[in-house]
Amino acid sequence: MTFTRRHFIQTSSALAGASGLGLLPAAAKPLSFRFGYSAISWGTDIEEAIKVGQRVGLPGIEPFRQNVVNYLDKPLALKKLMTDAGLQMVTCSNGGGPDFSGNFFDPAQTPKTIADHVKFARDFIKPFGYCDHFKMNNGPRPKGYEVSDDQIKVCADALNAIGMETIKMGIKLAPHPHVGSLIQTEHETRKLMELTDPRYVWLTADTSHLTLGGMDPIQIIKDYWPRLAEVHYKDAPRHLRGGKVLAVPKTGPEAGGHGWFRNLNDADGGGVDFPTLQKYLIAQNYKGWCVLDLDASMIPKGSNMEEVLKGNIKYMVDVLHVDPKTV
């Protein structure tokens, strides 16, 4: 029997009891990959984000640059806070601050973009000593919205230049297709992967953003498996499964996906086939991170991110039959 979202909602009470009694089936063997969560919704209060992660028990945390601005010159102090809480930094995403260039399509601006990203990887990510990749978004779309192949080539050249330097640090550069950004559709994603050098550029596959961009996230992961650095677990509305067109509007706050993201346990989720994805990652002996990339737009009224994380973790235990806190 297929365990659907509706079945999950209807039987959650019974499963909660079974889980508490240790009656749920365990994974056949320890997983080769680990789970983390995003710190994006805590702003600069990275200390509170760490405390929440410690309480819910996830082993990895993924901040953005804007989350760690108070630690840019003291990464080892932040590493100690994480270590003391039993956490490891998965990676740190780019972005944040007027001093940091995120333009990947204008040849006049990409030299600073390249320099800023190499410096951030060298001065902040590398000192952690164990981060093997640099997840990054690719900045805004150009004025007029449409993106040409020539502009994707400018982006690819910049990524190749950054990746050529970060790989010397033992860090794989892993761009993240993201609705509302320079790289959001299937054509743009595949063109970028075609134009980037696999020796220097990998991929962060966000299941929700790929779905909202009109892609099948499992197919994208399969097609670029040798270059997969990280997976973001985040759902989308059920009716978008199998869709082939961009789902989000071109302008406004929803252009970046806000209002379209779904938690794994949301009743109207199901745009992503997580049971099939999980089985594939296990079969392929995936050795990276899977991150619950949840943001403030996904918090129901009257709740908070800690409770949201607990709900997503419960779905993973009850439906995917894995406790992300223990792997």
Each PLM stretch: what is its role?
Residues 33-38, 61-63, 89-94, 132-136, ...:
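Hydrophobic faces of well-ordered beta-strands that scaffold small-molecule active sites
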Residues 40-46, 64-75, 98-102, 113, ...:
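Acidic-and-aromatic substrate-binding clefts and catalytic sites of carbohydrate-active enzymes
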Residues 12-21, 27, 104-203, 304-306, ...:
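Active-site acidic/histidine proton-transfer and metal-coordination neighborhood
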Residues 86-97, 116-126, 202-208, 260-263, ...:
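Short, basic, helix/turn surface patches
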Residues 29-34, 94-102, 138-142:
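N-terminal small/glycine-rich loop or linker at the start of catalytic domains
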Residues 2-23, 29-35, 47-54, 186-201, ...:
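Histidine-acidic metal/acid-base catalytic patches
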Residues 40-60:
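N-terminal targeting signals for Sec/Tat export/insertion, comprising classic cleavable signal peptides
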Residues 30, 50-55, 72-92, 119-130, ...:
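Acidic (Asp/Glu)-rich catalytic clusters
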